[in-house]
């Protein structure tokens, strides 16, 4: 499957939760491509938990990224508190959206395990492994292999490279 992971920005370049902007962007993409739309609860921003999660309710969103913890991205702290993660996971269940659990570092894979045990995360789950962000895990085969080794057998996962720095 081909997936587009999207964050929508307003005319000033700021992250937005404007439903009109999202629907317009999704329409422009779908007009040109047969592609899965991956929403996201992410984005370094001042949006509230509800504002960050609204994309999950859009019928065009079939899968959505959900970050499994907090991480520094460059000079910004990307805060994802455990209770917020639970709220978004429950929304995904309610709207039948498949979670893409974004694990920036090994401890976040443990969070996935715990949330599965609690019943907060249910299968199917897709694992996203973002690497190469300044302030996060560098991209290299050793780090990738370690992350894959920590995943459950038969896990569905993908790698996400930020920039060209580590390639």
Language model regions located:
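Short, acidic/polar
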Residues: 1, 47-57, 166-167
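Short beta-strand segments at enzyme active-site cores
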Residues: 2-11, 37-40, 102
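Glycine-rich, proline-tolerant flexible connector loops at the mouths of alpha/beta enzymes
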Residues: 3-25, 73, 130-131
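Acidic-and-aromatic substrate-binding clefts and catalytic sites of carbohydrate-active enzymes
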Residues: 14-15, 44-48
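Alpha-helix-loop-beta-strand connector modules within alpha/beta enzyme cores
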Residues: 14-40, 87-94, 145-155
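Short, electropositive alpha-helical surface patch
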Residues: 16-33, 53-63, 114-128
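A short acidic, glycine/proline-enriched capping/turn motif at secondary-structure boundaries
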Residues: 43-46, 70-72
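Catalytic alpha/beta core domains of metabolic enzymes, predominantly
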Residues: 61-167
């Amino acid at each position: 499957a081909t997936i587009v992971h999207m964050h929508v920005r307003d005319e000033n370049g700021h992250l937005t939760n404007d439903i009109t902007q999202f629907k317009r962007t999704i329409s422009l993409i779908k007009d040109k491509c047969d592609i899965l739309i991956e929403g996201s609860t992410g984005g370094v921003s001042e949006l509230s938990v509800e504002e960050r999660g609204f994309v999950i309710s859009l019928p065009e969103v079939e899968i959505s990224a959900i970050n499994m913890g907090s991480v520094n991205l460059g000079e910004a702290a990307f805060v994802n508190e455990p209770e917020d993660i639970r709220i978004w996971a429950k929304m995904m269940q309610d709207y039948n959206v498949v979670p893409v659990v974004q694990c920036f570092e090994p401890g976040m894979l443990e969070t996935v395990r715990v949330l599965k045990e609690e019943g907060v995360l249910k299968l199917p789950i897709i694992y996203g492994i973002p690497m190469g962000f300044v302030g996060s895990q560098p991209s290299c085969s050793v780090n990738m292999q370690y992350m894959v080794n920590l995943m459950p057998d038969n896990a569905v996962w993908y790698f996400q490279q930020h920039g060209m720095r580590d390639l």
